[in-house]
From Swiss-Prot:
GO term, biological process aspect, one: DNA repair
Protein's name in the database: Holliday junction branch migration complex subunit RuvA
Family: Belongs to the RuvA family.
UniProt entry tagged with the keyword Cell membrane: no
Organism: Desulforamulus reducens (strain ATCC BAA-1160 / DSM 100696 / MI-1)
């Protein structure tokens, strides 16, 4: 299995690149949000190779966690590479984890090609499979409720979901203003909803 491809960026377009590795050009499908260097500069993409009857296709990601999300999405019934790539393109890993943690169907149905049934299936199946991501982080949210009731714990829970210190603090502050009487679990959910449209 090819874990990554590293070479010179020979060509690019909407959702694809060609990487020149020692004179061989690899055509790789990528998320539309991938930040690329200028043509002729070195690029490294973590890859997944899809082998089908009609040929071989490479999917590449600038970050390993994007690739992990893509592979996990492929395990969901009815989700193929095209839909999985669309999800990763529209929802960064932190947003996908947040959507799973709060079972936010609306975030997923905004992705082109993802209907309500597919979104519900993704949430249902990945809630159990994302042990290193959604499940552990959702557990962190629950532990935060048990350990303390402070805003700092809410911030820490959001940091565990991949948000920056500034994003987490701002979201918690807004959540506390809009719902000062809520318990920590509800506070975190409100903060996640504040963060969801920001990415």
């Amino acid at each position: 299995m090819i874990a990554y491809i590293k070479g010179l960026l020979a060509a690019d377009g909407p959702g694809w690149v060609v990487i020149d590795v020692n004179g061989i050009g690899y055509h790789v499908s990528i998320p539309s949000t991938t930040q690329l260097p200028a043509l002729g500069h070195e690029v490294k993409l973590f890859t997944h190779m899809s082998v089908r009857e009609d040929g071989i296709q490479f999917f590449g990601f600038a970050k390993e966690d994007e690739k992990e999300c893509f592979l996990l999405l492929l395990n969901v019934a009815g989700v193929g590479p095209k839909v999985a790539l669309a999800v990763v393109s529209h929802l960064p890993p932190s947003n996908l984890r947040s959507a799973i943690a709060i079972e936010d169907v609306n975030q997923l149905v905004k992705v082109p090609g993802v209907g309500k049934k597919t979104a519900q299936r993704i949430l249902l199946e990945l809630k159990d499979k994302l042990k290193g991501m959604a499940a552990v982080e959702h557990s962190t949210l629950q532990q935060s409720v048990i350990t303390t009731g402070s805003g700092d714990e809410a911030v820490e829970a959001l940091l565990a979901l991949g948000y920056s210190q500034g994003e987490a603090r701002d979201a918690v502050k807004k959540a506390q203003k809009s719902a000062p009487e809520e318990d920590l679990s509800a506070l975190i959910k409100i903060a996640l909803k504040e963060l969801a449209p920001s990415r």
